[in-house]
Amino acid sequence: QRQMCIRDSRMYIANATGCSSIWGNSSPSTPYTVNAKGQGPAWGNSLFEDNAEYGYGMLLAQKAIRKRLKEEVEAVAASAEASEDVKAACQEYLDSFGCGIANGDASDKLVAALDGCDCDTCKDIVKNKDFLAKKSQWIFGGDGWAYDIGFGGVDHVLASGEDINIM
């Protein structure tokens, strides 16, 4: 029997306590799995009533970290000391910064190009490699959360206009 598996390594999931946490992450089985690199979705569970805000906070934190890393990549790309290979990897990363899967591939190339560089900026980028790729932020919850107790948060997140998914 074939089972559905969710294995997107760019997927960040905020889950409300309730029915979605039962089908979404109960022992001894889970719908989430890893890819060939051992990477899979990041799943977190919040209180029932604040899940929209929790997921939105995850998105804002990711955006802040990526903004700082983007500035570091721009500095490396502009450095006279950077090799042409490093500059090309930096440019590919910057060109695909908002493009999901393409940015994940560019992030891998960037880390490979910077691995072994001695400057503090390159070391920081490599150290934070898990935050380089654009993430796909999801907020999961049931009808009691979305239509009742958590509605104000859902409304706030949707009104933000951010690239976020609610299910």
Model-found features: residue ranges?
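N-terminal leader/propeptide and maturation segments of large enzyme subunits in energy/redox metabolism
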Residues: 47-121
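Short, small-residue-biased leader/transition segments that mark boundaries at the very start
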Residues: 2-6
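Gly/Pro-rich turn-and-neighbor structural signature
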Residues: 1, 115, 119-126, 132-137
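Catalytic or ion-translocation cores adjacent to nucleophile or general acid/base/metal-coordination motifs
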Residues: 22-56, 130, 148-167
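Solvent-exposed alpha-helices and their adjacent loops that cap or buttress functional pockets
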Residues: 7, 129-133, 138, 157-159
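Core nucleotidyl-transferase/polymerase catalytic module
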Residues: 110-117, 132, 163-166
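A short, small-residue-rich loop immediately preceding and capping a beta-strand
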Residues: 11-15, 135-149, 164-167
